């Protein structure tokens, strides 16, 4: 319980105190958007590192060499824990935004930093708004910013190594932007908090990055989803 309280306090303090550097970054972004992006990324990676240290979480990464360094990609990963983003973001090269549920946009200071690192907010209950998010993601990818999506649409509370069915249109961004998909398998992230909430316990998380998949070689949407899902499960 103490670890959970510490993690929450640190996160809240960062969001509050971070208003000052956030304003400075806003000013920097007026003249140099790329510099703003790079600094924002480093700051978020730093605070995530602090949260992992306080929570006693160890992260093992495999397959980092599979991530293309010369272009944006769509990361497609399984989702079991709030710590999935905290652990994975620190490993990613280049600017990467996550697709988050629309409710996250209701938290003012959190929303600010998420937008600074190019996160998108998805309303799955509104087809029109969902399409806007997909198109925004396509623009991000075409502009060289990678996107991470959890195609299950929610945290999977099933057995370790399982995956929920992909939500419809989960791979549309990569399809329309003609960018590769990098499947990602995250193992044992729920051991940090979800498996024994409200206690945070020491855990070892493994994140495996698979080889990029060219969606153009797969003719139908279902085949594309099946291929990526199979790769994710195989890596778990």
Task: Name each region found by the language model.
Residues 49-59:
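Transmembrane alpha-helices and immediately adjacent membrane-cytoplasm interface residues
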Residues 76, 137-139, 196-200:
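Short low-complexity, flexible loop/linker segments enriched in glycine and/or proline
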Residues 79-81, 152-156:
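Short glycine-rich anion-binding loops that position phosphate/pyrophosphate groups of nucleotides
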